[in-house]
A protein has these predicted regions:
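Conserved catalytic-core motifs of GNAT/GCN5-like acyltransferases
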Residues: 118-122, 129, 133, 138-155
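Short hydrophobic/aromatic beta-strand or adjacent loop that forms the aromatic wall/cage
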Residues: 56, 155-161
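Conserved glycine-rich acetyl-CoA-binding loop
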Residues: 67, 89-103, 112, 123-129, ...
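Residues at secondary-structure transition points
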Residues: 40, 44, 96, 123, ...
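Conserved GNAT acetyl-CoA-binding A-motif
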Residues: 109-121
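Conserved N-terminal entry element of GNAT/NAT acetyltransferase domains
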Residues: 1-20, 160, 166
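Acetyl-CoA-dependent GNAT
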Residues: 16-91, 102-104, 108, 145, ...
């Protein structure tokens, strides 16, 4: 899965995350999701991340010189895959890393027999919808928002389900 590229002339590789990556992953994810001020607390914690990594896989983009700059979660759910928690270090957003990780996640899910992939986008993050549409996703439904995090009082939020055939 290693595939070098460059970012600020530093070679990158995409690989599966390991338990040793969890501290750096926590920092990366919580930094990338800090824009979600409509929710209390951080995006994830070590226990949740450990549980996710037992259930599915996290892909990371890592500078060969060291340091994680992006990640995405994948999970096989029968004939469909799920992708979530796409995080890009704020200093590297807009550099193509999101697309690169989405493609890696899609390749992985396809190799596991998935014919489609689903994602969920919080309704408060409408700026993400055009990004996922450019990646080929279409809106297919809504789900109730549920998380250990608490919404800011007075804020409404639900999950927009988007899907893509692989």
């Amino acid at each position: 899965m290693d595939s070098p590229t460059s970012l600020d002339s530093s070679p990158l590789r995409v690989r599966l995350a390991t338990a040793d990556d969890r501290p750096a992953l926590l920092s990366l994810i919580n930094s990338a999701f800090s824009i979600e001020t409509f929710l209390d607390g951080t995006r994830t914690d070590d226990a949740q991340l450990a549980g996710m990594m037992e259930k599915g896989n996290m892909f990371v983009a890592e500078k060969v010189s060291g340091g994680l700059v992006a990640s995405v979660y994948t999970e096989v759910r029968g004939a469909r895959g799920y992708m979530g928690m796409l995080a890009v270090d704020p200093a590297h957003q807009g550099s193509g890393l999101a697309r690169r990780l989405v493609l890696a996640a899609e390749d992985y899910l396809r190799s596991r027999g998935c014919g489609a992939v689903d994602i969920t986008v919080l309704s408060q993050r409408t700026e993400l919808l055009p990004l996922y549409r450019r990646f080929g996703f279409v809106e297919t439904g809504r789900e109730e928002f549920s998380t250990p995090r608490t919404l800011t009082p007075g804020v409404e939020c639900y999950c927009i389900v988007m899907s893509k055939e692989l």
